[in-house]
């Protein structure tokens, strides 16, 4: 089975878990939790959120 990565936080998703967000243009985003889903819907950037994979990388650079 194919493992997917959470679009927002970067965590690996087990097959059959998580949420799928589909935009009107047909692009799809996989989310691991409602926390990631709500942050994405609010327009927050993963690199500015400290608990995400991309945010942790940004903290190391600063």
Swiss-Prot record:
One GO term describing the cellular component: ribosome
Database matches in InterPro entries: L24e/L24_sf, Ribosomal_eL24-rel_arc, Ribosomal_eL24-rel_N, Ribosomal_eL24_CS, TRASH_dom
Residues that span the membrane, as ranges: none
CC cofactor: Zn(2+)
Cofactor note: Binds 1 zinc ion per subunit.
C4-type Zn finger ranges: 6-36
Gene Ontology biological-process entries: translation
UniProt keyword list: Metal-binding, Ribonucleoprotein, Ribosomal protein, RNA-binding, rRNA-binding, Zinc, Zinc-finger
Amino-acid positions noted as binding Zn(2+) in the UniProt annotation, renumbered to this chain: 6, 9, 32, 36
Pfam family, one: Ribosomal_L24e
PROSITE patterns in alphabetical order: RIBOSOMAL_L24E
Gene3D superfamilies given in the database record: Ribosomal protein L24e (2.30.170.20)
Record GO terms (molecular function): rRNA binding; structural constituent of ribosome; zinc ion binding
Protein family according to the UniProt entry: Belongs to the eukaryotic ribosomal protein eL24 family.
NCBIfam families: PRK14891.1-1
Quaternary data: Part of the 50S ribosomal subunit. Forms a cluster with proteins L3 and L14.
Function, as annotated: Binds to the 23S rRNA.
Protein known as: Large ribosomal subunit protein eL24
Species in which this protein is naturally found: Methanosarcina acetivorans (strain ATCC 35395 / DSM 2834 / JCM 12185 / C2A)
Gene that produces this protein: rpl24e
């Amino acid at each position: 089975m194919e493992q997917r990565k959470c679009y927002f936080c970067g965590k690996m998703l087990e097959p059959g878990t998580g949420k799928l967000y589909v935009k009107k243009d047909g692009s799809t985003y996989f989310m691991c939790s409602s926390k990631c889903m709500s942050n994405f819907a609010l327009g927050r950037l993963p690199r500015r959120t400290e608990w995400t994979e991309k945010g942790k990388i940004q903290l190391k650079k600063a």
